[in-house]
């Protein structure tokens, strides 16, 4: 293990890298946008870059492009940020690029939310439909809710209903909402249960289901499915017993956010960045 210093960022460099995760934390300062970039091999490689724009990333990785370590990277996991994809293809020539499924599911839920809001706005605020879409929207998104619970008396509806009955009432409000919800559920189950081989076989079927639904709020999500098809399928590959994702990196973001809050009194941006990186690297992190 070697301690390397490059352009104000101190980080740990591991010679046998097999997995790389790209994510970032943005903090607005008086002088610039402060970005933290996390790389995670067997032991975390943590560094700080002042920008995540494509030009700067090219400038940074040019320092390393002749290094054999870049060829040891097998997988690169990222959110759907195009410059990350372009940089990874250029510098990690032997690596498979994977999209973190968390970001894709988040995008999908945001699209369904837009459908809900569009339908909601077509009803008066004192209507039953508005009440259901506003009060019980959680039933569309939270898959941890036990739908077949014991029914309770609902004053607004004037009868006993359980969560499943409420969901059925919501989905009956508009065909677009019902179709959008069913597509969301179908993709969520596909994402949670498919193997890599099953993902390769079934992805295009689900993709065309979204297209054939003709739901305008899903247009951006469909574009993401199209532009990131191979990277989404690659995310179903199992690495060290788990699907490839950046969940560990995202949890690290919470730690760094706390450190950022605790170092508000340090006005020198460079010193603040170095202290945060030192604090994170001092304890060390392992992917279990």
PLM regions with names:
Residues 1-13, 115, 279-283:
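Short, basic alpha-helical nucleic acid-contact segments in DNA-binding proteins
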Residues 2-4, 13, 21-23, 72, ...:
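Compositionally biased amphipathic helical and low-complexity segments enriched in hydrophobic
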Residues 5-29, 36:
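Two-metal-ion RNase H-like nuclease active-site motif
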Residues 30-42, 50, 60-98, 102-106, ...:
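Acidic/histidine-rich catalytic cores and adjacent linkers
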Residues 104-125:
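Short alpha-helix plus adjacent loop in nuclease-associated cores
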